Amino acid sequence: MPITANTLYRDTMNFTRNQFISILMMSLLTAFITVILNHALSPSVDELRILSSSGSDLSSSVESGLMDLIQQMTPEQQTVLLKMSAAGTFAALVGNVLLTGGVLMLIQLVSDGHRTSALRAIGASTPFLLRLLFLILLCTLLIQLGMMLLVIPGVLLAIALSLSPVIVVTEKSGIFSAIKASTKLAYGNLRATAPAIVMWLLAKIAILLVVSKLPISSPTVLGVVLNGLSNLISAILLIYLFRLYMLLRA
């Protein structure tokens, strides 16, 4: 029986509708964790003043490029900027790992007939979290590098790596073997994987543009809303990819 996109979309929407509360709670919970971690690890107010102390000089050199801007910073400003970047990256990474592990375990538990919740699914994913952490870190670096060089390589890498988290969790395989298997399956079924990945990327961009226009004064609330909606889109993609992999494996 051929695998069609319509069948995958229908199965994905059916599962999402039936488990919407758990998926929504997991998306918001991981978004909250991301925002709290970012806030806890970010530079203090005194350190942030170091960045703004010579803001007029820095703002006048923005047009010259990011690298020139960084080079014109003092060592203290560069340290604060690095700390801010590291805090945001680590917080987002932890949130993505918890979301990925939780959603994939939720699908498995529900498919096996178990009643579960967002917290229980995340707890059940504990044995895979460290492996997922290194996998998602590697995938994120590769995709962002591809996006920096040119958008198309980044999209192609996102397609190639899309099934690797599913393979790591379901097959309990290693990181590189999962990436190899994912690349082969993803490009072997490009009609099923490419549209989903492109739609996911466009949806995340649209969410960023829309939410940034909302009249929300609290940065914390804005961060939770933005990350929560982005996580919800990612959760739906994971459900789609899990269903696709199950059909391919069968």
From Swiss-Prot:
The chain crosses the membrane at residues 20-40, 90-110, 132-152, 156-176, 192-212, 222-242. It is a multi-pass membrane protein. Keywords: Cell inner membrane, Cell membrane, Membrane, Transmembrane, Transmembrane helix. GO terms for cellular component: plasma membrane. The keyword tRNA-binding does not apply. InterPro entries: UPF0259. It is found in: Cell inner membrane. It holds the Pfam family UPF0259. Its main location: membrane. Belongs to the UPF0259 family. This is UPF0259 membrane protein PC1_1998. It comes from Pectobacterium carotovorum subsp. carotovorum (strain PC1).
